Amino acid sequence: MAFLADALSRVKPSATIAVSQKARELKAKGRDVIGLGAGEPDFDTPDNIKKAAIDAINRGETKYTPVSGIPELRKAIAAKFKRENGLDYSWEQTIVGTGGKQILFNAFMATLNPGDEVSIPAPYWVSYPEMVALCGGTRFFVSATQEHNFKLQAADLEKAITPKTKWFIFNSPSNPTGAAYTHDELKALTDVLMKNPQVWVLTDDMYEHLTYGDFKFVTPVEVEPQLYDRTLTMNGVSKAYAMTGWRIGYAAGPIQLIKAMDMIQGQQTSGATSIAQWAAVEALNGTQDFIPENKKIFEGRRDLVVSMLNQAKGIVCPVPEGAFYVYPSCKGLIGKTAPSGKVIETDEDFVSELLESEGVAVVHGSAFGLGPNFRISYATSEEQLEEACRRIQRFCGACK
């Protein structure tokens, strides 16, 4: 009898976590490494949010909470959806989890049966397909190519939907590409979904507040209100509020789904950390002034990285609308010989050789389901980004 579960054979470790770990190991050995693999802001959590957590500790808010979250936070979430997205949810239609990952996992665990399909646009966040596999679902990938700025086309979505499709995962702005959908681009997709009433929509809006220029964020139910009864809208405080370590994600959706997710979570972690929940109340209800300030910094970094990467031999880097990632193509380097003498045959080879040669850690695009590309997180200092891009330029120039 095998000791480990068969389900583990269907999943693989997170490539983004692996890259960050490799960078840390090399740094520990004395290597000069610039890590551009981590998907978290380099800003500190705002002081008013930290103070709310300290105040909660001093008030004794250190006990178990309701499984789906404290009422104060769930009411703040409902108010956020009304204020920012024009969506009406009662607080009972919301749920709080230990990060967005738990929200997604609970939704799949509560709904997927063997044979149920989940349509996942590629490139995708590395955890989507692994969660689906762990929960017994079947992954169905549909490519959103660089030709279309990594945005899924309606005709391709239509082809990907079958009678067995239970969920469609939508992520805008995207991790890993930074691509974000306009109202009209999203309307083309929701029109397809309206023709397929068996398909539920799981929208990951974690990067909602990180869009640049005059881009206006929209979420699926805003664009097509008739999807309200079969959409789970997920968000969190990690990215916009620089609270990745606080581990608070949340969602709103149909009450029967929220209750099912509550049941799963009740046998799993129960409520998220009480202190972090009180901090999240302040994040959602308190001042939002730092968000545009941080966005301006991110936008400047984006422009710097895109400009410098497009000067590197063999690299083509589109300009993303949001998040804090770029997803350049390294197709022009495939078949070239790296300074080590190794022939670069895949984007994974490119990333490995770049790390060994120049000490720059990025994530290979094949980990996200579409290559030959690589993902850079520009959530680090401008000085670090400039140096990393110079090293990438040097490495690409040395490939023959």
Swiss-Prot record:
Main location: cytoplasm
Record-listed E.C. numbers: 2.6.1.1, 2.6.1.79
CC per GO annotation: cytoplasm
Cited Pfam families: Aminotran_1_2
Subcellular location: Cytoplasm
An example molecular function term from Gene Ontology annotations: L-aspartate:2-oxoglutarate aminotransferase activity
UniProt GO BP: amino acid metabolic process; biosynthetic process
Residues reported to bind L-aspartate: 39, 125, 175, 375
Modified sites of kind N6-(pyridoxal phosphate)lysine: 239
Statement: the UniProt record of this protein carries the keyword Cytoplasm: yes
Assembly, per entry: Homodimer.
Function: Catalyzes the reversible conversion of aspartate and 2-oxoglutarate to glutamate and oxaloacetate. Can also transaminate prephenate in the presence of glutamate.
Family statement drawn from the similarity comment of this UniProt entry: Belongs to the class-I pyridoxal-phosphate-dependent aminotransferase family.
Name the UniProt record assigns to this protein: Probable aspartate/prephenate aminotransferase
Annotated organism of origin: Rhizobium leguminosarum bv. phaseoli
Species classification: Bacteria, Pseudomonadati, Pseudomonadota, Alphaproteobacteria, Hyphomicrobiales
